[in-house]
């Protein structure tokens, strides 16, 4: 039995979906259940292995849609600037280093290579851009070998992506993706797939699913239909990670589902089980399905997170101390919390608020702190291990 967990992307400031998967991975390992975590998005800025390792996943438990049809392993990047220099067929006449970018110039050919490092000060190269006569013509992406190449041509004085080529370990071509704006055609030696939807459907069909396997759909945007159609004979589960409906739009006869779950709920008869994080949400969903749909789905409650043991403070707790730990995203409303603490400070001078996490709202929070001169009692802590 294998449990396949279907997701889209992952980042350095991951959402609760990825943390839920990380908790799930730990539980599966502790109980001896084989599990794979599948990511469907294209990753251009980082190596997927770096992102998943950061969350505690093992490389062997990760499947990337785009590398599945190659023989490449999920692995950290080891390609170096020296490796790149050996492969450049021209005389390198000048070198420039600016932060995470190393540029190698070949003056005679009017070409330069821009190597983007994994980290500033390291020699590890994530990708290389080749610029000829001022025009971007190619990007190469690396892990322990070249994973894939993007090809560009100038259109209206802009670099236009028209093809990606994916490689095997020996450098042979596994398949091509022909790109036309937001549309893609995937060309294999023995078949042509006319869309990413067909690509995902083909991927699902190649997993060799049996009636002993389980597919858990964590995110379905752009993938739901292909997954639903190609899961059987395995069982299909859907995780509800957020509020599943719009309370303001509910009437006696209609309900507005969260758009991220609308497809799954509309096809609930094809889902073997739904998972909610709380018994309250499960109860609400059952009532709503009974009232607004012809379906009576099987819904189970499994809390998202867990701790391996209960930790207690070694000394006395810090009085009047508040913390929050999350992505600093708009929907988390951490700015509301910061403003509330500023207000509370007026009647509770000892209050202290530590904000853990990073994200798009960080600058906004800094502004709130500075405008209210709250630096002494509201602190941005960034990413930290809060286990202990």
Question: Across the structure, where does each feature detected by a protein language model lie?
Answer:
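Short N-terminal targeting/anchoring amphipathic segment
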Residues: 83, 88, 203-223
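Membrane-proximal helix-turn-helix segments that form the acceptor-binding/catalytic region
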Residues: 203-209, 243, 252-274
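Short beta-strand->alpha-helix junction loop in the catalytic core
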Residues: 242-244, 280-281, 298-311
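A short, active-site helix/loop in glycosyltransferases that binds the activated sugar's phosphate group
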Residues: 261, 266-297
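Conserved donor-binding/catalytic core segment of Leloir-type glycosyltransferases
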Residues: 307, 313-332, 341
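Short donor-sugar binding/catalytic loops of nucleotide-sugar-dependent glycosyltransferases
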Residues: 325-329, 359, 384
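Glycosyltransferase donor-sugar binding loop
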Residues: 352-365
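Nucleotide-activated donor-binding/catalytic signature segment of Leloir-type glycosyltransferases, i.e.
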Residues: 364-384
